[in-house]
Amino acid sequence: NSNGASCHFPFLYNNRNYTDCTSEGRRDSMKWCGTTLNLYADQKFGFCPMAAHEEICTTNEGVMYRVGVQVDKQHDQGHMMRCTCVGNGRGEWNCVAYSQLRDQCIVDGITYDVNHTFTKRHEEGHMMNCTCYGQGRGWWKCDAIDQCQDSETRQFYQIGDSWEKHVQGVRYQCYSIGRGIGEWHCQPLQ
């Protein structure tokens, strides 16, 4: 690439002198030119301006589309996008994630519609109730679920869970009650 340098005419390509832009050697018909006299020696080329009706965009699979055409493409991270061929002299695509078009949220690779609720484990281990708000940006919010955390082990327990605990050699059965304040109680086992 020539970093925006102007065309140099004539330029030599395939043992032939070109005095105008060509699409020779390109499957996508994009017109190009050499930006030095000898393309082989210098490996410098650039794309030529095209009329809007000539311009195309090419997918990774080699499929060609005219300016204005919309296609659905999969992003490298797996989510789907709606892409429009805008061209701009470079075969440029403008893509928008489905989550923005459909006002959805993508969380941990799972797509949720607006107002859908779901649970998610926080990186510290506690569970959260989450809601997809979308708002054109895939926005979502989570609040901690009423649960308990053992003050010694830092382990989280959901309401109704029970676990055994040893304190100074005595075995206890503990119960998660919650009540909005993380309440839990333990009783000695006989």
Swiss-Prot record:
Q: Please give the InterPro entries that the UniProt record associates with this protein.
A: Fibronectin_type1 (IPR000083), FN_type2_dom (IPR000562), FN_type2_sf (IPR036943), Kringle-like (IPR013806)
Cited SMART domains: FN1, FN2
Gene3D superfamilies reported for this sequence: Complement Module, domain 1 (2.10.70.10), Fibronectin, type II, collagen-binding (2.10.10.10)
- Which terms does the record give in the GO molecular function aspect? heparin binding
Q: Which GO terms describe its cellular component?
A: extracellular region
Q: Does the keyword Repeat apply?
A: yes
Q: Which residues are glycosylated?
A: N17, N115, N129
For this protein, the record's SUPFAM superfamilies field holds:
FnI-like domain, Kringle-like
Which intervals hold domain Fibronectin type-I?
55-98, 103-145, 146-190
Domain Fibronectin type-II intervals: 1-50
- Functional description taken from the UniProt entry: Fibronectins bind cell surfaces and various compounds including collagen, fibrin, heparin, DNA, and actin. Fibronectins are involved in cell adhesion, cell motility, opsonization, wound healing, and maintenance of cell shape. May be involved in osteoblast compaction.
Q: How does it assemble?
A: Dimers or multimers of alternatively spliced variants, connected by 2 disulfide bonds near the carboxyl ends.
UniProt protein name: Fibronectin
In its UniProt entry, the species of origin is given as Notophthalmus viridescens
Its taxonomic path starts at: Eukaryota, Metazoa, Chordata, Craniata, Vertebrata
